[in-house]
C-alpha cells in the first residue's frame, strides 16, 4: 500500500473517481505551501514544486492505494504528468502526479495556485469550448 494524493478529477465526485473506487480514503489533505498549481489545457490540474518562489498549499484527497492499483492508475494519467513525491502540510510525504519538468519549461500552462484546489478553480470558471463535461470520463487524478 502507498499513499497517493489526488488533486483533480480522481477525487470523490470527479469524473475519473472510478479509477480509485474502493480504495481507502485517508482524508482531505493539503500539500505543504511549496507548490504551484497549473491547469493544463483546462482539462486537468498539475502540481509543480515552487523552486525559488512562493508556493501555495493545495487541497486534495489522500488515499491508501494497493501497489497494483497504483500501477493501473498511472496508466490512465496524461503524458504531461509523472509520478512524484510531495510533502503534505503536516510534514508527511505522499506520491502524487506532478507536472513533468519539460512541460513546466514550456510556460504554457495557466497558474491556478491562488484557487487552492481544482474544485475551486472549476467552480469559478466555465469549461472551455469543446472541453468534456464533468460527467465525461477522464484519466486525470
Language model: regions and residue ranges:
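Glycine-aromatic micro-motifs
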Residues: 1-130, 134-137, 141
Amino acid at each position: 500500500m502507498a499513499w497517493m494524493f489526488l488533486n483533480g478529477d480522481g477525487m470523490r465526485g470527479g469524473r475519473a473517481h472510478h479509477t480509485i473506487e474502493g480504495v481507502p480514503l485517508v482524508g482531505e489533505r493539503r500539500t505543504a505551501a511549496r507548490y504551484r498549481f497549473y491547469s493544463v489545457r483546462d482539462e486537468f490540474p498539475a502540481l509543480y514544486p515552487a523552486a525559488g518562489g512562493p508556493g501555495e498549499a493545495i487541497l486534495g484527497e489522500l488515499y491508501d492505494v494497493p501497489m497494483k492499483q497504483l500501477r493501473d492508475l498511472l496508466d490512465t494519467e496524461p503524458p504531461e504528468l509523472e509520478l512524484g513525491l510531495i510533502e503534505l502540510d503536516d510534514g508527511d510525504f505522499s506520491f502524487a502526479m506532478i507536472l513533468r519538468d519539460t512541460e513546466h519549461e514550456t510556460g504554457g500552462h495557466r497558474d491556478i495556485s491562488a484557487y487552492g484546489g481544482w474544485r475551486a478553480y472549476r467552480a469559478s470558471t466555465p469549461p472551455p469550448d469543446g472541453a468534456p463535461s464533468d460527467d465525461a470520463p477522464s484519466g486525470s487524478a
